[in-house]
Amino acid sequence: MRKLTKWLIAVDILIALCFFVVYCPIFKNLQNTIISTAIDTKTHDYIAYTFYSEERVQEVIDADKFEPINEEINLDEIVIDTKPRDSYDNEYDEAILTRDPGNEHYKYLKIKVGGYDAHLVAIYDPSEVKLLTSKKFNTTTDARYGGGQEKIINMTKRLGATVGINGGGFVDYGYGSDIPLGYVIKDGKVIWAENDKPGSLIGFTNDNKLLLIKATGEEAIKQGMRDALEFGPFLIVNGVTPKFNNVVGGYSRAARVAIAQRKDGIVLFLVTEGTHTAGPNMKEVIDTLVNYGAWNAANLDGGTSTQLVINGKLMNTPKNIYGRKVEGGRSVVTGWGLIPNEEKTADTTE
């Protein structure tokens, strides 16, 4: 009986401490981190609204925002040049342009972003960057138990991609689903639309340029969109970066995924280590991409969904909301991959 009493007292104390941390004004910075991290993941924002009022959540969102880039993308700035070069602008340029012997498709770099381990992949030919999609979308009316979602490691094997990262968001009540958020465009056709409203579309045109556009799926296709998904925010447009409202750097800290393109057409996949509450902030991600020559860039789904696969191996360590490792990566619905062109593959194997 005494043991039970002590256990109940311990539970009561723990609950009291949790409420103290969640609501006491002296822990406001930690509370801000909890809210901004939950909102940032886009699929776990219910956590913020469970513990805090809409007014409190909105207060944090407003403080953590950065001003959107007021630029219409100009793809004429992108002049694709896939030939090897031996002159460099700086050390970052040299790191990208110095190709690994025997690998004309991509280069993998292990770097730091905001003090966190990170992975950068430079893909030399943007025509080899294709949208990855899971086996099926919306296989059941119960969004929590859709069976069509797929881990990036399995997507890459099934679709023949040597490199793959996760992409857009999806409906998630804690169990995941196979229902994408927003639009999905594949081979110039809308294969999924959550609604008919304009969204932040991230994709590649028929001439293999990264197009960042606020539009409906059909509007994007009219502008030459080949493959696209919906997510955001846009991080760099025409070399212009956002202005931040506070010193936090926007969107708090978390594991990050971003896609970018340099003016020479080289595509960058950036994936960082972290959790839902630890990892680079958005400014640190942007600064890193700028260093490596990104001219246009966008944020992709981070947190637990964060995945980079190279040659069938998961390169990062995805962690769930509790900080535990997610073996093999989380099941998602979209991503971006390097699928080698058959002609180039034939040339390099002769």
Regions found by a protein language model. Name each.
Residues 2-193:
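Zymogen propeptides
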Residues 116-118, 147, 158-160, 197-199, ...:
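Extracytoplasmic
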Residues 118-122, 201, 234, 258, ...:
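Conserved hydrophobic/aromatic beta-strand scaffold that supports enzyme active sites
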Residues 127, 208-210, 265, 304:
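Structural signal for glycine-centered tight turns and loop->strand junctions in beta-sheet-rich domains
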Residues 135-140, 216-220, 272-276:
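Short, solvent-exposed aromatic-acidic interface loops
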Residues 163-167, 212-213, 237, 296-300:
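General beta-strand structural signal in soluble alpha/beta enzymes
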Residues 170-246:
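Active-site-adjacent helix-turn-beta-strand microarchitecture at beta-sheet edges
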Residues 175-195, 244-296, 300, 305-350:
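Conserved, well-ordered active-site substructure
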